[in-house]
Amino acid sequence: MAIEKSVASASIAEVIDRILDKGVVIDAFVRVSLVGIELIAIEVRAVVASIETWLKYAEAVGLTVDPATT
């Protein structure tokens, strides 16, 4: 995959279109402690993609179920 450098700015619609086309994975872990006592821990894993992108990925890694076998 080649990386292209562009000096033109992108509109929000173009950014959203690219995110939905390629997909984005957000993986975050936050821990709040006070004097060594964990008060709160938050773990987030989120995927943002279009349904078409997800279906292509799911088919490629074998996550889809054949309707004829169910």
UniProtKB/Swiss-Prot annotation:
Predominant subcellular localization, coarse grouping: other
Transmembrane segments: none
Alphabetic keyword roster: Gas vesicle
One matching Pfam family: Gas_vesicle
Signal peptide coordinates: none
Entry's Gene Ontology cellular component terms: gas vesicle shell; vesicle membrane
InterPro entries, sorted: Gas-vesicle_GvpA-like, Gas_vesicle_GvpA, GvpA, GvpA-like_CS
Location in or out of the cell: Gas vesicle shell
GO MF annotations in UniProt: structural molecule activity
Assembly and binders: The gas vesicle shell is 2 nm thick and consists of a single layer of this protein. It forms helical ribs nearly perpendicular to the long axis of the vesicle.
PANTHER family documented for this protein: GAS VESICLE PROTEIN A1, GAS VESICLE STRUCTURAL PROTEIN 2-RELATED
Annotated function: Gas vesicles are hollow, gas filled proteinaceous nanostructures found in some microorganisms. During planktonic growth they allow positioning of the organism at a favorable depth for light or nutrient acquisition. GvpA forms the protein shell.
Similarity annotation: Belongs to the gas vesicle GvpA family.
Protein name, entry field: Gas vesicle protein A
Species of origin: Cereibacter sphaeroides (strain ATCC 17023 / DSM 158 / JCM 6121 / CCUG 31486 / LMG 2827 / NBRC 12203 / NCIMB 8253 / ATH 2.4.1.) (Rhodobacter sphaeroides)
Gene encoding the protein: gvpA
